[in-house]
C-alpha cells in the first residue's frame, strides 16, 4: 500500500525503527486499519465486538518486532481503539506502537488507545510507545492512552514511552500487576510547551515474591505548560521497587510530581526520589564559551537530559 506524505512523516516521527509493511504489522489511520500483515509466530486479528485488534504472539517468537502505529489526520475525529496482546510463555518480542496526530483544522483531533497485555511465564517483552502532534490548525491534538499489563512469573517487561512534541493534552493511565520473579522497567520521557497539559498516573502492584520494578520519569516543561506525575508502587510481598522523577522547569511552567510508595509486607523494599529544578546557569555558561547562544545551549542540555 502506498502511503501519503503526511502519513509517512508522522510514521517517521513515532516509529524509531522505520515502519515497513513486512512481518507482523498493523497501521490504523483515521479509525480504520488500512493495512496489516502476519508473520510465522505473530498473528493479528480484527476484533468482532469493538474497534481494535488482538495480537497473538506464540512461544517460539524470538526477537521479532511488531509494528502497530496509529495516525490521525482528520480534524474533528475521536478515535477509540482496543488492542489486546496475548504473549505465550517464553516468547521474546519487541512491540513498537505510538500515535501521531496531524491536525490542520479548527476542530479537536483525539485518539484513545486502550492496550492490555496478557504476558505468560518466562517471556521478554519490550514495548515502545511514542506520541507526536503537528499541524497548522487551531484544533487541539489530544492523546489519552490506557495501558493494563499483567506480567507473568519470571517474565521481563520493558516499557519506553516518549511524548515528543505538539500534543496539547494528554492523560495517561497505566496499571501493572506483577507475579513472582517478574521484572519491570518503565522509562517515561515528556516535553511540553506553550499551554499544553500532561497527566500521567501509574500504579504498579508487586503481587509475587521476588518481583522488582524500576520507574524513571524525565520531563521538560516550557512556556505555560502544566505537568502532573503520580507513580504509585504497591508491594504486597517480598519485592523491590525504585521510583525516580526528574523534571526541568522553564519559563512559567508548572510541574507536580507525586511519587507514592505503599508497602504491605515487611519484606517489601520501595524507594522514591523526586527532583524539579531549572537549568543550571553554570552549564549554560560553559556551553556558551564553546560558541553556542543561550537557546542552542538550552537545547543541548534538554536533549542530553531526556536521552
Language-model regions, residue ranges each:
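Small-residue helix-packing motif on alpha-helices
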Residues: 297-298
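Conserved beta-strand/loop scaffold segments within soluble protein domains that form the structured core
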Residues: 9, 23-29, 34-292, 302-307
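Terminal domain-initiation and capping elements
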Residues: 1-3, 9-11
